[in-house]
Amino acid sequence: MITIEQLLDILKKDHNFREVLDADGYHYHYQGFSFERLSYDSRQVDGKTLFFAKGATFKADYLKEAITNGLQLYISEVDYELGIPVVLVTDIKKAMSLIAMAFYGNPQEKLKLLAFTGTKGKTTAAYFAYHMLKESYKPAMFSTMNTTLDGKTFFKSQLTTPESLDLFAMMAECVTNGMTHLIMEVSSQAYLVDRVYGLTFDVGVFLNISPDHIGPIEHPTFEDYFYHKRLLMENSRAVVINSGMDHFSFLADQVADQEHVFYGPLSDNQITTSQAFSFEAKGQLAGHYDIQLIGHFNQENAMAAGLACLRLGASLADIQKGIAKTRVPGRMEVLTMTNHAKVFVDYAHNGDSLEKLLSVVEEHQTGKLMLILGAPGNKGESRRADFGRVIHQHPNLTVILTADDPNFEDPEDISKEIASHIARPVEIISDREQAIQKAMSLCQGAKDAVIIAGKGADAYQIVKGQQVAYAGDLAIAKHYL
């Protein structure tokens, strides 16, 4: 429960309070209300709900519906003049985060918090950390792929970083379940829209940066994207940073006065020997590590997670066992066809991660390589040119472009846009299952491979704003082995 007095005190301390408006006019103080629930969904309110009117598409009709369900007061940046009191604020998203934090009893203070950011590798690194910490502790995890609040039950995540009301409700459930640590992926979008406003992490990890999520509804420029990524460093007590990433010198200067550790080529924490399924490291993680996920970049993700978990109480033995046990749904999953050709299913969904994926496969498969690829509609438009650039640099690839969450766009138009950046003919088959079947039918022997990129373990396609059932890349590939 939270009272109106407590609510106003939080807003005033954050300099986010304007006034309370009701039929009697303006009020600096207010009383007589307490709330047992928080909501930003007008369909889920009653007389004891504190409702947040948020979003560029919010309509007064939503508020009218909530009032008919018993709503007595709301928080907003706008007075909709509907006859009930409104708490007016300058920034509704910041208000949501701080009020949710207090409402749920500050659960962040009862968990050790580890956050990963980066253009690629967040989910893989989070899974490594989860398995490392699980050896001696009780970690919960919020990742793009899956969420677990009790270490036993996993459910599909809707957002990389949940909305603040959901985030703190889930954190509180983690505390109730006896969890000791929480591992999170923190997206640039989470900082752009203040989902984690006011939250301080025990350790923040910056894996890498490359242009992505740049478009009309995301970040307008790379500078804006990079800036919002860096906010995790400002909001972490200690940081772990990849010294091999672009703009590392800037980040090194930024974190000079806080606890930090670097890994990679310009640090003492390096991979000294790399094999397909093992690596040797020097520095704080000195030793031998077995790993199921192929690729040097996955070994670097394991290093990042290991250094972070070392700060959170994990032993070197915990880290070794955790790395050896880690598998990630939809990340570098490998199938073998009856003719011994390989099928790689991976979530690679931007130019940088696609380049890494192709390079790893080319190390191991020297025959005909087939790539199945698409790009999402109505977001991350810059990826399309990036995909074309990467494909152009791999001339031996046979490419089939297909649908990947086309949303409100025509998947064929998206494919044609990608194709416009490739200086050789490519095939377009918009039906993703047909594209996979066609590619697999062209493989003839053990040196050949099909690379299915983009959707990973997702068992749906986003079409016209809705999740439409889709068997999933892995299930389809298994069917045609």
UniProtKB/Swiss-Prot annotation:
A motif (L-lysine recognition motif) lies at residues 404-407. Transmembrane segments: none annotated. Carboxylation is probably crucial for Mg(2+) binding and, consequently, for the gamma-phosphate positioning of ATP. UDP-N-acetyl-alpha-D-muramoyl-L-alanyl-D-glutamate binds at residues 42, 158, 160-161, 187, 195. Pathway: Cell wall biogenesis; peptidoglycan biosynthesis. It is found in: Cytoplasm. It holds the Pfam family Mur_ligase_M. It catalyses: UDP-N-acetyl-alpha-D-muramoyl-L-alanyl-D-glutamate + L-lysine + ATP = UDP-N-acetyl-alpha-D-muramoyl-L-alanyl-gamma-D-glutamyl-L-lysine + ADP + phosphate + H(+). GO terms for cellular component: cytoplasm. PANTHER family: MUR LIGASE FAMILY MEMBER, UDP-N-ACETYLMURAMOYL-L-ALANYL-D-GLUTAMATE--2,6-DIAMINOPIMELATE LIGASE MURE HOMOLOG, CHLOROPLASTIC. The gene is murE. GO terms for molecular function: ATP binding; magnesium ion binding; UDP-N-acetylmuramoyl-L-alanyl-D-glutamate-L-lysine ligase activity. It is an enzyme of class 6 (ligase). Coiled coil: none annotated. The modification N6-carboxylysine is found at residue 229. This is UDP-N-acetylmuramoyl-L-alanyl-D-glutamate--L-lysine ligase. Its main location: cytoplasm. Disulfide bonds: none annotated. It comes from Streptococcus pyogenes serotype M1. InterPro entries: Mur-like_cat_sf (IPR036565), Mur_ligase_C (IPR004101), Mur_ligase_C_dom_sf (IPR036615), Mur_ligase_cen (IPR013221), MurE/MurF_N (IPR035911), UDP-N-AcMur-Glu-dNH2Pim_ligase (IPR005761). ATP binds at residues 118-124. One of its GO terms (biological process) is cell division.
